[in-house]
């Protein structure tokens, strides 16, 4: 006896008191090339194989396939199977329609989750960069949603927006992303800022970039020359006080250091003559493209610097017991 819910075969002798469920013999006998030398309590497979359990029309009235169902009950062969398939056609069509509807609904839900609706602005969902200095920003509308979906990045500027939650949960201020540099302000022309200052000194080479040198052209000489004979021209202090066009945040004029060539020539002349006469001063100013006053002030500061160096050198040698 073959039980569909069991994984093994049971001999009919075990159920002698029960009536046999199979009232008719097997309609499809199969033979196998191997011999069935099985145990006595195991029934051979060919005795229980391919029983026509559900092919009677009386047991399955809803299948009503007409001639197909009758043919299946009589023969059970290929002809009956082919005729019975006509009774399943409505059920197959309904199942196929239901599967197609489910697939369409799933696809629509997936598209709705991925792409934003047409009514909403895509820049709300995707953090579009703000336009800088009136530059044209990205296009708005449903057409930009698809491009923003692949090109939009999160607030870190590198990873997609799905990683923003990690930056929000991280301690410290949130990463603001690469910030665009502000446009540099137009530089104020020096002539407009220094209109109130009179041009120092007299003549000689007005085209020099160092035409408006300060009393301290050298880095150390300016700081060390205070209180001496080279304080600077008296007209500059009055110009700084009365110059209304000078910017308030700038208390002194911009430093204009000398070039290496100018410093080398001035140092060479200072090595031979600590005090320079007017003729030599005019000659240097023409050769170095400087004004007469610039050369004069440089020598004043250089003398103060040499005086301070001599004083420091003397203190070092007298304070050190080894000398």
Swiss-Prot record:
Ranges annotated as biased composition (Gly residues): 223-235
Sequence ranges of Low complexity compositional bias: 211-222
Source domain of life: Eukaryota
Region described as Disordered: 164-255
Principal location class: nucleus
Keyword DNA damage belongs to the record: no
Sample GO molecular function, one term: DNA-binding transcription factor activity, RNA polymerase II-specific
Biological function: Sequence-specific transcription factor which is part of a developmental regulatory system that provides cells with specific positional identities on the anterior-posterior axis.
Family to which this protein belongs: Belongs to the Abd-B homeobox family.
Protein's name according to its UniProt entry: Homeobox protein Hox-D11
């Amino acid at each position: 006896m073959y039980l569909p819910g069991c994984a093994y075969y049971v001999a009919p002798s075990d159920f002698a008191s029960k009536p046999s469920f199979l009232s008719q013999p097997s309609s499809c006998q199969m033979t196998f090339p191997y011999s069935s030398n099985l145990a006595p309590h195991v029934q051979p497979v060919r005795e229980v194989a391919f029983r026509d359990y559900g092919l009677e029309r009386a047991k399955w009235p809803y299948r009503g396939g007409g001639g197909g169902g009758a043919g299946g009950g009589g023969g059970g062969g290929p002809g009956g199977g082919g005729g019975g398939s006509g009774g399943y056609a409505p059920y197959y069509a309904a199942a196929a329609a239901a599967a197609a509807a489910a697939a369409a609904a799933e696809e629509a839900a997936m598209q709705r989750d991925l792409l934003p609706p047409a009514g909403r602005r895509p820049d709300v969902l995707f953090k579009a960069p703000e336009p800088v200095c009136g530059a044209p920003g990205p296009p708005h509308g449903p057409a930009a949603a698809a491009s923003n979906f692949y090109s939009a990045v999160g607030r870190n500027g590198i990873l997609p927006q799905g990683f923003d939650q990690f930056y929000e949960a991280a301690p410290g201020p949130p990463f603001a992303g690469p910030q665009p540099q502000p446009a540099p302000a137009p530089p104020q022309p020096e002539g407009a800022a220094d209109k109130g200052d009179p041009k120092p000194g007299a003549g000689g080479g007005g085209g020099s970039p160092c035409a408006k040198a300060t009393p301290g052209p050298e880095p150390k000489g300016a700081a060390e020359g205070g209180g001496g004979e080279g304080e600077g021209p008296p007209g500059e202090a009055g110009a700084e006080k009365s110059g209304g066009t000078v910017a308030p945040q700038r208390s002194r004029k911009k430093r204009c250091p000398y070039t290496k060539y100018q410093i080398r020539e001035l140092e060479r002349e200072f090595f031979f003559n600590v005090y320079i006469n007017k003729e030599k001063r005019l000659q240097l100013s023409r050769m170095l493209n400087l004004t007469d006053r610039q050369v004069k002030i440089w020598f004043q500061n250089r003398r103060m610097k040499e005086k301070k160096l001599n004083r420091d050198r003397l203190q070092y040698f007298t304070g050190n017991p080894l000398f």
